[in-house]
A protein has these predicted regions:
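Hydrophobic alpha-helical segments, chiefly the membrane-spanning helices
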Residues: 296-301
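Phosphate-binding/switch region of NTP-binding enzymes
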Residues: 173-282
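The Walker A/P-loop phosphate-binding site
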Residues: 2-112, 128-133
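Interfaces that engage single-stranded nucleic acids at replication/repair/recombination sites
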Residues: 7, 11, 291, 302
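Conserved inter-motif catalytic segment of the P-loop NTP-binding fold
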Residues: 26, 64, 75-76, 80-182, ...
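Active-site phosphate-binding and catalytic loops of NTP-dependent enzymes
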Residues: 50-51, 137-138, 235-241
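Conserved small/polar residues in nucleotide/adenosyl-binding loops
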Residues: 285-292
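Residue-level signature of catalytic and energy-coupling elements of molecular machines
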Residues: 41, 103, 151, 202, ...
């Protein structure tokens, strides 16, 4: 078929996301990666120490309570804002777990972070889409780098759950998983079109009755399908003498469209403004052979 026929079809179907593959796929192609502030974590996410978070995809950080998901995210935000002087972050917050002091102590420019409290998945959907639609209305040359954060998906309620609680009903909301899936179906294309990354924190739980000890991410299958990368976090304390100064975070890719799945690394996260240790873990996985790259030397859980 001729390219002119394809062009005519694109005009006819009136789909803003349609394009010839040869011209690039606006919502699918990754134009750049965002440095996380840790070389080893960059390699885990993208296969390169100079990579990091894909600039237009959803990345999920999951773990049990107090594994450092929020602190980990704050460290990525800090590095993103320092690298991009005109950038901004929209932080959708459902846990009431962050404060201005927490941002300031970690060296984050609080004037470039907007905190948006959200209570339900519907509220998150509506407000995030409003921000994206306004961003897409700008001329491309006027769009400054932007990042979305949802902290956390697991704490979001639903409109039905709140209405049932107010009415004194104790019934479980069986629609939540479907609502979450619907939200990410809409957001995935919008984020790709706008070239905006979304970091989602979520909780994990032990699967009852599993043959082997197994962790599962909460919230249904919506995030599992929508996220390009899902990383499970666990931690051990990092001490300076007797003082706990941070955590050693073990990261495992449960899903990845850019690197191998089930790879594991460890990185160091300080509680203060240092955040993620840029060089921690690199020496262990550095290979003397050019054919045996850093990623291939990472241990696998498989």
């Amino acid at each position: 078929m001729t390219s002119s026929f394809f062009t005519d079809v694109i005009k006819t179907i009136d789909n803003e996301y349609a394009s010839l593959a040869d011209d690039g796929i606006s919502a699918g192609d990754v134009s750049s990666f965002i440095d996380t502030g840790s070389y080893i974590f960059n390699a885990l996410l993208s296969g390169s120490i100079n990579g990091g978070l894909p600039s237009n995809k959803i990345t999920a950080l999951a773990g049990e309570s107090s594994t450092g998901k929020t602190f980990f995210t704050l460290s990525i935000i800090k590095n993103f804002l320092e690298t991009n002087k005109d950038a901004g972050v929209f932080y959708f917050e459902s846990e009431s777990a962050v404060s201005k002091q927490m941002f300031a102590e970690r060296g984050i420019d609080t004037k470039r972070v907007m905190i948006i409290p959200v209570a339900t998945v519907q509220q998150f959907r509506q407000q995030s889409l409003v921000v994206l639609d306004n961003y897409l209305k700008l001329d491309q040359k006027d769009r400054k780098p932007m990042m979305f954060v949802l902290d956390s998906l697991g704490m979001l309620s639903t409109t039905k759950e709140i209405e049932d609680s107010e009415a004194g009903k104790e019934t479980r909301d069986m629609t939540r998983a479907q609502v979450v899936k619907a939200i990410f179906r809409v957001l995935t294309l919008k984020l790709g079109k706008a070239d905006v990354p979304l970091i989602v924190t979520n909780h994990t739980y032990d699967v009852v009755g599993a043959y082997m000890p197994t962790k599962e991410m909460g919230g249904g299958s919506g995030l599992k399908y929508a996220a390009s990368t899902i990383v499970y976090l666990s931690k051990a304390k990092e001490k300076d003498g007797t003082d706990v100064v941070g955590n050693l975070i073990r990261c495992e890719t449960k899903k990845s469209r850019f690197t191998r799945e089930n790879k594991k690394i460890s990185t160091r996260l300080f509680y203060d403004e240092r955040g993620l240790d840029k060089y921690y873990g690199c020496l262990l996985y550095t290979s003397p052979s050019p054919r045996d790259g850093l990623l291939s030397r990472m241990p696998s859980s498989a």
